């Protein structure tokens, strides 16, 4: 089960958005639940792969993605109606890990735009390791 807590943050002083519930629905690949977080005309952009999705296309991309997933929210920042959520995502067998940075802009408590950036976790490139610069942020990545 994902290591997430239910977390509501206020938007504009009165409307709540449950960002942790949204991330949990995505990790569980629960299309009905995912849909409940979006405005009907929401736009979703995956910038790393130059893809723009409708809500229904986003749900297909997530729910038909192979495997079972887990993850945990590492950081959340809120600026007015914009949530920046950084999530560590990994397959249930923990054979790999990824980081997703999600910029979630809400309107009336629903996601109006979602801009996501995905990266594979891994070793620095050889040329940088050979320079012997930097150090690990954490000792264990997965």
Regions found by a protein language model. Give the residues of each.
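C-terminal and inter-domain tail/linker signature
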Residues: 2-142
């Amino acid at each position: 089960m994902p290591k997430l807590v239910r977390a509501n943050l206020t938007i504009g002083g009165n409307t709540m958005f449950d960002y942790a519930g949204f991330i949990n629905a995505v990790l569980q690949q629960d299309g009905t639940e995912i849909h409940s977080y979006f405005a009907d005309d929401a736009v979703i952009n995956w910038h790393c792969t130059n893809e723009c999705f409708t809500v229904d296309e986003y749900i297909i991309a997530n729910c038909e993605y192979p495997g079972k997933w887990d993850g945990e929210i590492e950081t959340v920042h809120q600026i007015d109606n914009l949530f920046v959520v950084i999530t560590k995502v990994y397959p249930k067998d923990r054979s790999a890990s990824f980081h997703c940075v999600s910029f979630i802009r809400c309107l009336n408590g629903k996601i109006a735009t979602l801009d996501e950036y995905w990266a594979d976790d891994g070793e620095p490139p050889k040329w940088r390791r050979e320079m012997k610069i930097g150090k690990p942020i954490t000792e264990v990545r997965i």
